[in-house]
Amino acid sequence: PSMLPESVLLRAAAEMLDYEGSGQSVMEMSHRSKVYDAIIKGAESLLREVMEIPDNYKVLFLQGGASSQFAMVPLNLMTKNRKADYVLSGQFSTKAYKEAARFGDCKVVASSKEQNFSRIPDLDPKEFRPDADYFHICMNNTIYGTVFHALPETGDVPLVADISSCILSRPIDVSRFGVLYAGAQKNVCLLYTSPSPRD
């Protein structure tokens, strides 16, 4: 998890008792109120601007951390052929795979587990299933210090990525993905990487 700038913490503290003159905290207001509606619409607008999210993509703010998506993704996407392909590059992609395997036919198309997840595994497109409902990766692995520098070419199969550790740390071409998800508890961070043979 990254540190929030002091200015952000001070503003949040100041608005804890009275959000912009509303007489209440954000934690107290109804999610149906005009004040809260303006907050969520403003947050979505800023996220769309910063990430250059195309208009044909929806932005969802959901309860729970990114780990809840380990079940939500297969429950919502693994519906046609009940198949999904997973790249195991660390702890979180492995957890995502194990959870998804409870709901359908999940295939590990590449893994660097034998190398203690010290690198992103080599991908062989011949292992990718053209009838998979989606293809899942975890773009950045903070525990192991690895990151995808190039995205897999999945053809007509939607690419799904956990970007919890790298959201807003570098530009991402959102249009390359079917779904991107991230947990807010990691905050928005700066990510420093250097070229390495491990990548």
Region locations from a protein language model:
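N-terminal "arm"/small-domain region of PLP-dependent enzymes with the aminotransferase-like
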Residues: 1-30
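Generic secondary-structure signature for well-ordered alpha-helical cores
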Residues: 14-21, 45, 49-53, 102-105, ...
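Conserved N-terminal alpha-helix of the aminotransferase class I/II PLP-enzyme fold
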Residues: 21-69, 76, 90-91, 98-99
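Short active-site oxyanion
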Residues: 57-59, 82-85, 156-158
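PLP-dependent aminotransferase-like
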Residues: 67-135
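Active-site phosphate-binding strand-loop segment of PLP-dependent enzymes
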Residues: 100, 112-167, 179
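Conserved active-site segment immediately N-terminal to the catalytic lysine
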Residues: 160, 174-186
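Conserved small/polar residues in nucleotide/adenosyl-binding loops
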Residues: 192-199
